[in-house]
Amino acid sequence: MILVTGGSGLLGTELITQLLAQNKKVTAIYNKTALPNFNSPLLTTFKCDILDVVGLQEVMQQGIKQIYHCAALVSFNPKRKKDLFKINIEGTANIVNAGLDAGVTKLVHVSSVAALGLLKENEPINETIAWTEQANYSNYGESKYLGELEVWRGIGEGLSAVMVNPTIILGAGDWDGGSSKIFKSVYDEFPWYSDGINGFVDVRDVATIMIQLMDSDITAERFIISAENKSYQDIFTLIANAFHKKVPAKKVTPFLAKIVWRLEAFKSRFTGQEPLLTKETAASALAKTYFDNSKLIKYLPQFTYRSIQQTIIQTVGVFQQKLNNH
């Protein structure tokens, strides 16, 4: 039996889809958002918070042998630091402990490239680049790095585990939240773009890689999962063209970004709403960050990434269908 945490998220949902397609029995847990209806007798779902140790023990009694840990909080709002640390560190520690206690055969833990260190601009980041406090610009990155340390602790205590560090995951998820928000912004003809560069990857590729790593003998390794390094301008242009919408034409400068995130922080203090832009997201949007994906290809030589252009065209097609059905 396989356990998937964070089953209602973009990646968790895709992972469950692929596992069920392989006729594998899956137990999925979720916290606030219920899972979509997979309509499969192979799937069992439980409402269980990863901070609930007793609840996790009950779930593990289903005869769990493999764990895919996708559950996490993603936020770049400085006010949510406590929540980030609680869920991404303590929650991961609970999963590791549950796996050790149940004697699972393997854990695949979803980390993030935010848990890696930073280099000078234009130098590609690989898995050996260590996270440092000086190079860190987000509480999220720190929480994911410390979450990885919990997995390494588990490995030290005899757990077989691998960690995946995806870049920005693209797919047809909830376009009011997460990385799928990029599609909504462009659809709404948001006029701004940044010339920052980042890694991007199809959600289907991330799920496929995770399953291949789980079914391999590979353990005690971390892998960057990234198809291509692209500028946000290129990504926005591809999405706009696929939707037949106006391409964003106003460039965000560092000076403008500073003004906007300060205004958003001020507004958030009074409204209690999440800021649209924070100091952390502004820094990320302007940074030119390149990722080296060669380690994964070395370990899984048969694997080929989808092109990001293909991903965007297909994802826009799914969103367009959803919009037409409303």
Predicted features, each with a name:
Residues 85-89, 126-129, 136-148, 168, ...:
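Short-chain dehydrogenase/reductase
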Residues 44-90, 94, 98:
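NAD(P)H-binding glycine-rich loop region in Rossmannoid oxidoreductase-like domains
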Residues 90-139:
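Conserved Rossmann-fold NAD(P)-dependent oxidoreductase catalytic core, especially the SDR/UDP-sugar
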Residues 209-276, 298, 307-308, 313-326:
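Mid/C-terminal beta-alpha module of Rossmann-like enzyme folds, strongest
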Residues 2-22:
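N-terminal Rossmann NAD(P)H-binding glycine-rich loop of SDR-like oxidoreductase domains
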Residues 111, 148-172:
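Conserved beta-loop-beta element that borders a ligand/cofactor-binding pocket
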Residues 146, 177-178, 194-214, 220-221:
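Substrate-positioning beta->alpha
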Residues 76, 113-123, 169-175:
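Conserved catalytic-site region of short-chain dehydrogenase/reductase
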